[in-house]
Amino acid sequence: MNPPIFIIIMLTVISGTMIVVTTSHWLLVWIGFEMNLLAIIPILMKKYNPRAMEAATKYFLTQAAASMILMMWIIINLLHSGQWTVLKDLNPMASIMMTTALAMKLGLAPFHFWVPEVTQGISMSSGLILLTWQKIAPLSILYQISSTINPNLILTMSILSVMIGGWGGLNQTQLRKIMAYSSIAHMGWMTAIMMYSPTMMILNLTIYIIMTLTTFMLFMHNSTTTTASLSQTWNKTPLITSLILVLMMSLGGLPPLSGFIPKWMIIQELTKNELIMMPTLLAMTALLNLYFYMRLTYTTALTMFPSNNSMKMKWRFECTKKMTFLPPLVVMSTMLLPLAPMLSILD
């Protein structure tokens, strides 16, 4: 893609998200979503091939349907209340349908089917944008209307998302699909705590974005897209491969890594609100995520896939890829747990 055109498209994507995050007017929210959607399609098709086109088409149809539902209920709420303000009380039925539309945009279960397919069909860099930046705008609207959301609806979606995020990733060998199912599970954790502590949802989103960004950057550095290719990288870049394995454990929420912080605090907050079954179900289903991450770690670190190469060690050439941002990102993705006592300010 032509660099000036790419810069313009990225600025449009960023502008659309910023409009959604900063506005309190429903019409501007819809405009921001549409700007973001129309600008992200060329990024998804950056590598022009049939799979990328199919993925971009699936993404466009899903997001367009969600935007249509959202706009329809914005108008119905306007007729009911006579105002466009996001923070005002919503009509209960409008709140349910708006939550459903935003869940479609986020990829929450049972509207999650597009996430793995779209992520698998696009490049790693496009998948990184899809699974991180594209989550900010819908979550910001859910954050603003969290006081009017139907609790039964959002808690059901969150439990289903964590379950499907765990089950879906069990039989995957494609790293992009594994990250997609991980994203579905993390979105479930964020929406579970949204009604009780919206600030904690922002903390969870921040840590998730840092961990996912670091993991994708390491995948792109190693040019790996499958578990088989990941297992072949230990003799080329042993340090990077080791970091990927630690990051996988952090994404799974294994203590004492950074990914354990949001899960720990969410379970604690839900327990304070006298919800016993909810954190129990979340903790049990989170083991599914940890299991497929540990299995991926095992196949990568302790086994080797069959190879036709008669040489045991591949040549190690000097690395020419710049890694300026990786060291601080790796530290933040793995070593934030000692800072957890400082998070008491969220209370």
Curated annotation (Swiss-Prot):
It catalyses: a ubiquinone + NADH + 5 H(+)(in) = a ubiquinol + NAD(+) + 4 H(+)(out). GO terms for molecular function: NADH dehydrogenase (ubiquinone) activity. GO terms for cellular component: mitochondrial inner membrane; respiratory chain complex I. It comes from the Eukaryota. One of its GO terms (biological process) is mitochondrial electron transport, NADH to ubiquinone. It holds the Pfam family NADH_dehy_S2_C. Its EC number is 7.1.1.2. The chain crosses the membrane at residues 3-23, 25-45, 59-79, 96-116, 122-142, 149-169, 178-198, 200-220, 242-262, 274-294, 325-345. InterPro entries: Complex_I_Subunit_2, NADH_DH_su2_C, NADH_UbQ_OxRdtase_chain2, ND/Mrp_TM. It is found in: Mitochondrion inner membrane. PANTHER family: NADH-UBIQUINONE OXIDOREDUCTASE CHAIN 2. Belongs to the complex I subunit 2 family. Core subunit of respiratory chain NADH dehydrogenase (Complex I) which is composed of 45 different subunits. Interacts with TMEM242. Core subunit of the mitochondrial membrane respiratory chain NADH dehydrogenase (Complex I) which catalyzes electron transfer from NADH through the respiratory chain, using ubiquinone as an electron acceptor. Essential for the catalytic activity and assembly of complex I. This is NADH-ubiquinone oxidoreductase chain 2.
